[in-house]
Amino acid sequence: LVKTTNRLRSNAPLQGGLIIGNRIPKEYFVTKGTGESEITVHAGSYHLALKSAGIEMANIITYSSILPGIAKKIHKPKEIIHGAVMETIMAVANGHKGELVSAGIINGWLIDRETGHRYGGLVCEHNGNYTLKQLENKLEASLNELYINGFEERYALQNIEMHTSSLTPRKEYGSAIVALCFTSYLYPILA
């Protein structure tokens, strides 16, 4: 490691080494929660929504909305290491006292019409001041738009799941979250 680090610093050409491709999310779970605070959103109601969802101990990173074909849904792990990085596809709605806030995620799998193999998945997130029915309609419309604009000719969209969370805060601030959380990854070795 020291020799490699010294070579990198000197800009000398490296001999050998492992070339790894972009990692691919392999396993995930879905969770949701709500939180309220009299103090603030980010260190208040949002954090308490993460706690309600059971992921408050993690450092959250958000992704865009694609699931690889190898991804598999699992149960939430019993333990998440405090301070671990948790990569998610997340919907978050924040609001004030008396204001309905709703967050949701919808996902479906693209199945190759010719082979029957699972190609990958699409995920859409949405949040706002919606009733659950309004939120569900927006999520369905978003997923349909993604599917129609790039995938419907070759793939069927199947196994659709929707997860929602909503809250009308009684305290000054309120948050609702839904998160698809990745727990493991495949690292392709290229050379």
Residue ranges and their predicted role:
Residues 2-191:
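Helix-coil modules at protein/domain termini and other flexible surface or pore-lining loops
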